[in-house]
């Protein structure tokens, strides 16, 4: 798809859920793929402690560190997955101070957000910002400057209101933008324009003449 369409780019990485199932030469394979001109990030990588059947934490951490080292070597940003692993995720990225990227679908505390922002990371906001029980999201948004915000959908999951419970769609990213714009007291169009620019800057994307709708 990235080869076929000018406005589609790719990221490559080993998600934490299959950690331990990778071939012995997986890092060499990732490095080869990451050198493709349309690959703009290493990801989605990280830690996932939510499911009991997920690989052991130590194994997930080992795979994560190896990929962060690859991102450092290739000077690529990271798309980070952190589910119920906030403490270990923060501790490990601190080991790689010259690697940054986006904590996608950020669910940590405002304090964690501030630490990541101080290290140069972006934070990704998605469907849960529209939920009535989203108590932490407004607090995180309050401490996150517009310059470090990205919007996403995490399709087909995390569907925003009023479509919650249905399959998510990338076009619903506008609903995320509208809620964040409300919290930031700015026009949705301003937030959409800003976050699109942030995404391009983070991923070093030179956009085609006509941009597709803003979505990550």
Feature names for model-found ranges:
Residues 1-16, 28, 99, 198:
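Helix-coil boundary/capping segments in enzymes
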Residues 2, 90-103, 203-216:
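Short, electropositive alpha-helical surface patch
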Residues 7-8, 39, 121, 149:
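Short, conserved active-site loop motifs that form the nucleotide-linked donor/cofactor pocket
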Residues 12, 40-45, 147-155:
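Non-cysteine beta-strand/loop elements that form the S-adenosyl-L-methionine
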Residues 14, 105, 127-129, 153-155:
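Short secondary-structure boundary segments
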Residues 16-119, 131-132, 139-140, 144, ...:
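Divalent metal-binding pocket/active-site signature
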Residues 70, 170-216:
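Mid-to-C-terminal alpha-helical segments outside catalytic/metal-binding sites
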Residues 138-139, 178:
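Active-site phosphate/pyrophosphate- and oxyanion-stabilizing loops and adjacent acidic/basic residues
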């Amino acid at each position: 798809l990235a080869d076929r369409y000018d406005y589609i780019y790719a990221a490559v990485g080993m998600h934490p859920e299959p950690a331990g199932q990778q071939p012995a030469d997986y890092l060499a394979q990732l490095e080869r793929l990451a050198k493709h001109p349309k690959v703009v990030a290493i990801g989605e990588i990280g830690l996932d402690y939510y499911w009991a059947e997920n690989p052991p934490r130590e194994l997930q951490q080992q795979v994560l560190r190896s990929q962060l080292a690859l991102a450092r070597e290739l000077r690529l940003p990271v798309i980070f997955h952190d589910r119920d692993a906030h403490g270990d995720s923060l501790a490990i990225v601190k080991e790689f101070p010259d690697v940054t990227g986006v904590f996608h679908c950020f669910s940590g505390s405002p304090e964690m957000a501030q630490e990541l922002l101080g290290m140069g990371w972006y934070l990704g906001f998605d469907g849960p910002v529209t939920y009535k029980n989203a108590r932490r999201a407004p607090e995180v948004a309050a401490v996150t400057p517009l310059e470090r915000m990205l919007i996403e959908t995490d399709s087909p999951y995390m569907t925003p209101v009023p479509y919650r419970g249905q399959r998510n769609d990338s076009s619903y990213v506008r609903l995320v933008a509208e809620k964040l714009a409300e919290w930031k007291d700015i026009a949705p169009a301003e937030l959409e324009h800003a976050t699109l620019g942030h995404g391009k800057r983070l991923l070093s994307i030179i956009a085609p003449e006509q941009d597709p709708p803003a979505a990550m």
